[in-house]
């Protein structure tokens, strides 16, 4: 049996008036996911355990079969693993966003989805100006970077994700708690370094949002994972543009497949991801394919972009993998779901359970669902499932 786990990050949503009261999944044209729902079984998955933040780190860890209540130590350590940054036992890793601040408010948590090339220059400048024996900056992808603090500095600091406070005054959300003042001052110092940087002056001339500040959040120390193969007796691989997902794969001992042109946005290389998934399943039992675009569109509050992202995920990821599964000599199981909702109305993550559908090429019994969406999933035979149990259920099913 081969397994494909296909994640459309943030696809789930709430009913939208401009769509006639439909959710994004209900309004989008998604024939491949609808086929899986009609010819497989559907239900709702609780991806965010009680008491943990509604983040892609927690949700995707759950979907990959790792209970966050046991394994979760923060978002940034996972991203550090993907970037090849080794953490000492007393290191604290922070996600370090490049953001746009205007009139004392966060205008854009992504600094206009700044290019990785521009961002690298800015992060290297910050490391030269603000880095020292206890602080180091590491460049990542687009607006997503890393700050490493020594001697457990910031381990108990209270931080807020920037995508949760778009349009809000930063003074109300600067780091707080133990050592909060230190990291608040660091953010303010970054503004001085970045404001007149040539990269930002050029971006302003081009009508783009400048990356005129950092924002730190999501900190934690290195987690300890049981290898995926030891847990489930299956070999696996991860395909994603996002360091967070790659880092989960690294800690799980899975292959992390790099796909050229995978950006984590609407312009990602969908075909490259689908082809890589099909190829890796020649030698591995399971592939986990993650697409970030629907989540980014949700954070932007763009109905049109989110519809396009979901339809592209369906036609350019799900459809080719489904076609391959149906024509393969080996039996296939496909699991498709979002990791969490990123509703247009709130522009951030929600904790609600998400729809999921499972299709097996060697089974004919199904729920005969009319479509893959939130409402259909409520009527599914699989009911409400703890997401961290899903992989175990799939690989043990007869």
From Swiss-Prot:
Catalyzes the interconversion of 2-phosphoglycerate and 3-phosphoglycerate. Pathway: Carbohydrate degradation; glycolysis; pyruvate from D-glyceraldehyde 3-phosphate: step 3/5. GO terms for biological process: glycolytic process. Its EC number is 5.4.2.12. This is 2,3-bisphosphoglycerate-independent phosphoglycerate mutase. It comes from the Archaea. PANTHER family: 2,3-BISPHOSPHOGLYCERATE-INDEPENDENT PHOSPHOGLYCERATE MUTASE, COFACTOR-INDEPENDENT PHOSPHOGLYCERATE MUTASE. Keywords: Glycolysis, Isomerase. InterPro entries: Alkaline_phosphatase_core_sf, ApgAM_prokaryotes, Metalloenzyme, Pglycerate_mutase_ApgM, Pglycerate_mutase_ApgM_sf. It comes from Methanosarcina barkeri (strain Fusaro / DSM 804). GO terms for molecular function: metal ion binding; phosphoglycerate mutase activity. Pfam families: Metalloenzyme, PhosphMutase. It catalyses: (2R)-2-phosphoglycerate = (2R)-3-phosphoglycerate.
């Amino acid at each position: 049996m081969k397994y494909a786990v296909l994640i459309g990050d943030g696809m789930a949503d709430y009913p939208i008036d401009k769509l006639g009261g439909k959710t994004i999944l209900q309004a989008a044209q998604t024939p491949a996911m609808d086929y899986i729902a009609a010819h497989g079984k559907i239900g709702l998955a609780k991806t965010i355990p009680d008491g943990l933040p509604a983040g892609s780190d927690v949700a995707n860890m759950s979907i990959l079969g790792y209970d966050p209540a046991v394994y979760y130590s923060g978002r940034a350590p996972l991203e550090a693993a993907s970037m090849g940054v080794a953490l000492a036992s007393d290191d604290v890793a922070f996600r370090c966003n490049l953001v746009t601040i205007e009139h004392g408010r966060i205008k854009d948590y992504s600094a206009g989805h700044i290019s990785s090339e521009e961002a690298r220059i800015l992060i290297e400048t910050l490391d030269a100006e603000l880095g020292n024996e206890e602080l180091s900056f590491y460049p990542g992808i687009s607006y997503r970077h890393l700050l490493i603090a020594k001697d457990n500095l910031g381990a108990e600091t209270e931080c807020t994700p920037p995508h949760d406070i778009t349009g809000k005054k930063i003074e109300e959300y600067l780091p707080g708690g133990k050592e909060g003042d230190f990291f608040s001052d660091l953010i303010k110092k970054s503004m001085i370094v970045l404001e007149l940087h040539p990269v930002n002056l050029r971006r302003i001339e081009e009508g783009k949002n400048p990356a005129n500040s950092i924002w730190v959040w999501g900190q934690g120390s290195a987690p300890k994972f049981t290898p995926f193969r030891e847990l489930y007796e299956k070999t696996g691989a991860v395909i994603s543009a996002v360091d967070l997902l790659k880092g989960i794969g690294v800690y799980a001992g899975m292959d992390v497949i790099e796909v050229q042109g995978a950006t984590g946005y609407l312009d990602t290389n969908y075909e490259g991801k689908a082809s890589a998934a099909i190829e890796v399943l020649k030698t591995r039992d399971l592939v986990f394919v993650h697409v970030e675009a629907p989540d980014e569109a949700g954070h932007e509050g763009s109905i049109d972009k989110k519809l396009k992202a979901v339809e592209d995920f369906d036609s350019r990821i799900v459809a080719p993998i489904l076609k391959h599964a149906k024509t393969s000599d080996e039996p296939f199981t496909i699991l498709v779901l979002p990791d969490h909702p990123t509703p247009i109305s709130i522009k951030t993550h929600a904790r609600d359970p998400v729809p999921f559908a499972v299709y097996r090429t060697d089974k004919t019994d199904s729920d005969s669902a009319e479509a893959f969406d939130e409402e259909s999933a409520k009527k599914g035979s699989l009911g409400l499932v703890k997401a961290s149990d899903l992989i175990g259920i799939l690989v043990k099913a007869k």
